[in-house]
UniProtKB/Swiss-Prot annotation:
Nucleotidyltransferase in keyword set: no
Stated role: Component of the FACT complex, a general chromatin factor that acts to reorganize nucleosomes. The FACT complex is involved in multiple processes that require DNA as a template such as mRNA elongation, DNA replication and DNA repair. During transcription elongation the FACT complex acts as a histone chaperone that both destabilizes and restores nucleosomal structure.
Ranges of biased composition (kind: Low complexity): 995-1005
Gene Ontology cellular-component terms listed: FACT complex
Coiled coil: 103-128, 467-517
Keywords: Chromosome, Coiled coil, DNA damage, DNA repair, DNA replication, Nucleus, Transcription, Transcription regulation
Gene Ontology annotations of biological process type: constitutive heterochromatin formation; DNA repair; DNA-templated DNA replication; nucleosome assembly; positive regulation of RNA polymerase II transcription preinitiation complex assembly; regulation of sister chromatid cohesion; transcription elongation by RNA polymerase II
CDD domains: CDC68-like
Phylogenetic classification of the source organism: Eukaryota, Fungi, Dikarya, Ascomycota, Saccharomycotina
The encoding gene: SPT16
Compositional bias (Acidic residues): 957-994, 1006-1018
Organism expressing this protein natively: Debaryomyces hansenii (strain ATCC 36239 / CBS 767 / BCRC 21394 / JCM 1990 / NBRC 0083 / IGC 2968)
UniProt KW Metal-binding keyword: no
Designated name of the protein: FACT complex subunit SPT16
């Protein structure tokens, strides 16, 4: 028990529920005494042990718990007591006090402890108010023997408190419900595994007993191979990121029955008789996760008769009636059973005598709560939050058309796990129950039609299945079982509707959760408007004092001072400096013998949408005067060309520096790597890094040190890359199966510099094959004599890939282990992947436990699932072959992520995956303008959620976008504020200088002058207005 950690808050919360119920019945029981002896493997559901697990999360053998209305006392060994010490501190003032009375190896000291307990019990109890205990629970062991010896003559009075404990534990909190949900999912997957195994046995006519098949299913959860190799095992392991295989156990051994002998009691067992592949096969199984139970049972048919099918259809109808009208908050348990019985009497009275004696029970840590069974005697009410195993069945039915006398008798069962709610209950075990999913046909005759209850003809097999049957009959190698197992095929409309209904219910809750989270995260104070916009004014200064001006300006020519980033212009016989940040753009043209150079400068309101610019060159003020443009002319054409080019180059360099400064703003300098020495350093040789520090592709060594990783080039010792564990956000290993490289990938919290590149992703890889080209001829052919088909070469490549995977995965796990829990290894699930276009080309995007990734082709895609606010599906409409996926992040300042052109046939798979990882989904027929949407959300997030939040995404696109019905995605990003395009094009921008110098020369000067500068008449009019204004003042 070295890793035992007891949740103190959960313990005190649950203890208070017991004490509250104890207070309400204080006229019956005064206190509780619950003693546990040695562990009993034959009966794991003793209520006293269940109570320990519920309160503490663990079973404490040889331990007693004494509970009164205001305190709780533990009597246990000194070794176990140390795990309980944190319970003695009260989390709140109203919490009960907790005392720990240790037991010793000395029996005499223990007697003194028990005598002290007996004195407490005598004070609290009397014959009218006895001590509560669980009468059915009988334990053995030294602890129990010592207690019995001391208490035998004490004259204590006891009564059963099973009902009190049941009422305390019946309502499941969010943590308990999450565990039950995982257990139910596990049972559903294992039922699918059973169906696959059973189909193979029946189809291939193997001789297997019911008990042998039960053991085979039971052993699966203990097999690592099953989790990693089989489709069902992978499905269970990958569908839930919080799933831990070590916490899964069986509630009971799977019950498999066939051959005419059936028992619908929960205590039934699989017989040792052979599995009979005819008539009816019953399968019941239940898994528990973190001790919380689930239950599911199904009836499988092999060539059923019409009467059998009719009875089963009625069983489905009965379950639907019970769940839709009876199984809800406030209903008395006996009314559930009586309502089911009344429905049978009204619809099929001949089945009343075959109906089970109860129709389910309350479940939790205890598989079957005997104090809450859905029968005719139980007067307790269903409550919101209870977990119910609803079991409906008919036993001892007769099949008159059975050719085998042993198969004349059959039974039907249908069990599912539900959570009670105020409306219809929530189905947790979603294994298909439709007859088309559980019936298999072996006979070659064409399916006949039978009359359904409403009088219409009802075919036993759908047209799709009939066509499939004809195709299978033509191919003797194919299985005779007609149930389709293809990924994208739905063989039963009713089951598909049920699955869609479940997904919609889950999505509805996820959307509601996001809405509540949004209202909780933001307030009215988070709203921003235009008045909150505070532009940053660039601070620059060419020269502090006049003496710093270069001496060569005395010639009164135009000079460019590269050192001080300044243009010096001769104005009125004096050199006037202009910092390069004040320069906006310019133009040059020739007229006659003169060359004109026009320079435009930044000034407030000189064009462009100011609200879109984070930095401005000047602050507008009535005390400031601004020079908007100046024109100079010279007869020296070459001089003017050189000056203009020098000014342009200086501007480009200035803009480039500003951009680099902004890009480096989030680069955080890492702490120093603590190096290990000698053999303590774990290494992975012959790996390459992306991005490369140098232009040449050079291999190196990846090393694990005390607090991080170091990549060291094998040629240049000064070329190394350090990555600290504390800066690794995600660590991935990607196999080279079906790929050309094997990868260990680090996605970082803060970017680092590799060479001159800033990067959030660092990747270490090795090529899986050294075959650069196919040598089908030449000298090497003689070395492959006899292997012209390259079979041996392919086998060798597969072997090499397997070794690479093993080596890299082991090293990745070593990285995770060395990080002391800071880094957790994540592996992509290729079978859940889907193709799409996140950037420029179509790639395979693969989910992992925590992310959605694409690591093969740069730029890499790493989307953290926990950071996603909502996923929106665009262009989802009939007739299109593709759709788009948009991720909106909880941080609304982050840009949305688009994955375009996903094949439409993967739509359901993408929806299922997003639902499984608890991401709300919306969909629409059009592409949305996300820049405008996010600007609206950022401006007032509280009002956005107050107005309904993301609910608007479930509607169709705006009318202005309805003309976008192209099948292909839009890859061009539209301007979020198109109204200022004309102003921008006329006024120009500093962004013009961010391109290469080769793309801008003097040839475009004339057109620039026409677009950028104002004509002389306009300037004179403005000057006159300004003079008039100043004169009037």
């Amino acid at each position: 028990m070295s890793e035992v950690k007891i949740d103190s808050n959960s313990f005190h919360k649950r203890l208070s529920l017991i004490q509250k119920n104890l207070t309400s019945i204080q006229d019956k029981q005064s206190c509780l005494l619950l003693l546990v002896g040695a562990s009993d493997d034959e009966n794991t559901y003793k209520k006293t042990t269940v109570l320990q697990t519920w309160l503490l999360g663990y079973e404490f053998v040889h331990t007693g718990i004494y509970i009164t209305q205001d305190k709780c006392v533990f009597i246990t060994s000194e070794g176990k007591a140390k795990y309980l010490t944190n319970l003695t501190s009260k989390p709140t003032e109203n919490s009960s006090s907790v005392e720990i009375w240790p037991r010793y190896k000395d029996a005499e000291k223990n007697k003194e402890t028990f005598k002290k307990l007996i004195e407490e019990l005598k004070k609290m109890s009397s014959r009218e108010k006895p001590i509560g205990h669980i009468a059915k629970d009988q334990y053995r062991g030294k602890f129990i023997d010592e207690w019995n010896e001391v208490s035998a003559d004490a004259g204590l009075s006891f009564s059963d408190c099973a009902l009190l404990l049941s009422e305390s534990m019946e309502i499941k909190d969010s943590e308990e419900f999450a565990n039950t949900k995982i257990a139910s999912k596990s049972s559903t997957v294992l039922m699918d595994a059973f169906a696959n195994e059973m189909m193979v046995v029946v189809d291939e006519e193997k001789k297997t007993s019911n008990s042998d098949l039960s053991e085979k299913i039971e052993d699966k959860i203990d097999s690592n191979k099953w989790y990693t190799k089989s489709a069902t095992g992978k499905k269970l392991l990958q569908s839930m990121k919080e799933f831990d295989p070590s916490l899964v156990d069986w509630c009971y051994s799977p019950i498999i029955q066939s051959g005419g002998e059936y028992d619908l009691k929960p205590s039934a067992q699989s017989t040792t008789k052979a599995l009979v592949g005819d008539g009816v096969i019953l399968a019941s199984l239940g898994l528990r996760y973190k001790s919380y139970c689930s239950n599911v049972a199904r009836t499988f048919f092999i060539d059923p008769t019409p009467a059998m099918e009719t009875n089963y259809d009625f069983l489905l109808k009965l379950q639907n009636h019970v769940t839709s009208t009876l199984l809800r908050d406030g209903t008395v348990a006996s009314q559930v059973y009586q309502g089911a019985l009344d429905f049978i009497k009204s619809e099929k009275p001949d089945l009343v005598q075959h109906f089970t004696k109860n129709c389910g029970w309350l479940m939790g840590i205890e598989f079957r709560d005997s104090t809450f069974v859905l029968n005719s005697k139980n007067e307790r009410k269903l409550q919101n939050g209870q977990i119910i195993s609803l079991t409906l069945g008919f036993s001892n039915l007769t099949n008159d058309k059975a050719s085998n006398p042993k198969l004349k008798q059959y039974s039907l069962i249908l069990t599912d796990t539900f959570k009670v709610s105020e409306s219809e209950p929530i189905l947790l075990t979603t294994y298909p129950k439709a007859r088309s999913e559980t019936s298999f046909y072996f006979k070659d005759d064409e399916p006949t039609a039978v009359k359904s209850e409403n009088g219409g003809d009802k075919k036993l097999k759908s047209e799709k299945n009939i066509k499939t049957e004809k195709n299978l009959a033509a191919n003797e190698a194919n299985s005779k079982i007609l149930k389709s197992k293809l990924r994208h095929e739905s063989s039963a409309a009713d089951d598909s509707n049920n699955t869609e209904k479940i997904r919609q219910e889950i999505q509805s809750k996820l959307h509601e959760k996001r809405q509540h989270e949004g209202l909780a995260r933001f307030s009215k104070a988070d709203a921003t408007d235009a008045s909150d916009f505070k532009p940053v004014f660039k601070k620059y200064e060419s020269y502090v004092r006049e003496s710093q001006i270069p001496s060569n300006v005395r010639d009164l020519k135009i000079h460019v001072d590269y050192k001080n980033q300044t243009i010096i212009l001769p104005i009125c016989g004096r050199p006037v400096p202009f910092h390069i940040n004040s320069f906006k753009n310019g133009s040059q043209n020739e007229e006659g013998d003169f060359t004109y150079l026009r320079l435009n400068f930044n000034s407030p309101g000189a064009g462009g949408n100011v609200s879109r610019r984070a930095e401005l060159p000047y602050e507008d003020s009535p005390e400031n005067s601004f020079l908007r443009s100046v024109t100079l002319r010279s007869r020296d054409h070459q001089r003017m060309v050189d000056v203009y080019k020098a000014i342009q180059d200086l501007k480009k360099d200035a803009v480039k520096r500003e951009q680099e400064k902004k890009q480096m703003a989030d680069v955080v300098s890492q702490a120093n790597l603590v190096e290990l020495k000698g053999s303590r350093v774990k290494k992975l040789d012959q790996v390459f890094i992306r991005p490369q520090p140098d232009t040449k592709k050079i291999g190196g060594v990846l090393q694990i040190h005390e607090n991080g990783l170091r990549y060291q080039s094998s040629i240049r010792m000064d070329q190394k890359v350090d990555i600290l564990f504390s800066n690794i956000k995600h660590l991935f290993f990607q196999s080279c199966k079906d790929e050309l490289i094997v990868i260990i990938h680090c996605h970082l919290k803060n970017p680092i510099m590799i060479g001159k590149k800033k990067t959030h992703d660092v990747q270490f890889y090795r090529e899986a094959s050294d075959m650069a080209f196919d040598e089908t001829g030449g000298r090497k052919r003689r070395y492959r004599y006899g292997d012209e088909d390259e079979l041996q070469q392919e086998q060798e490549e597969r072997r090499r890939k397997a070794l690479l995977d093993k080596e890299f995965k082991a090293f990745a796990e070593l990285i995770s282990d060395s990080s002391s829990g800071m880094v957790d290894l994540d592996i992509p699930f290729r079978e859940l992947g889907f193709s799409g276009v996140p950037f420029r080309s179509s790639v395979l995007c693969m989910p992992t436990r925590d992310c959605l990734i694409q690591l093969i082709d740069p730029p890499y895609l790493v989307v953290t699932l926990e950071e996603i606010e909502i996923a929106h599906l665009e262009r989802v409409q009939f007739g299109l072959k593709n759709f788009d996926l948009v991720f909106v992040f909880k941080d609304f300042n982050k840009s949305v992520v688009h994955i375009n052109t996903i094949p439409m046939e993967l739509l359901e798979d993408v929806k299922s995956w997003l639902t499984d990882v608890d991401i709300p989904i919306s969909e629409g027929q059009m592409n949305l303008n996300w820049a405008t949407i996010m600007k609206t959300v950022q401006s007032d997030p509280y009002q956005f959620f107050a107005d309904g939040g993301w609910s608007f995404l479930t509607g169709e696109g705006d009318s202005e976008e309805e003309d976008e019905e192209d099948e292909e995605s839009e890859f061009e990003v539209s301007d979020p504020d198109p109204s200022d395009e004309d102003v921008e094009s006329e006024a120009g921008s500093e962004d013009d200088y961010s391109s290469d110098a080769s793309g801008s020369d003097a040839s475009g000067g004339e057109s620039e002058e026409e677009e950028e500068g104002e004509d002389w008449d306009e300037m004179e009019r403005k000057a006159a207005r300004e003079d008039k204004r100043l004169g009037a003042s």
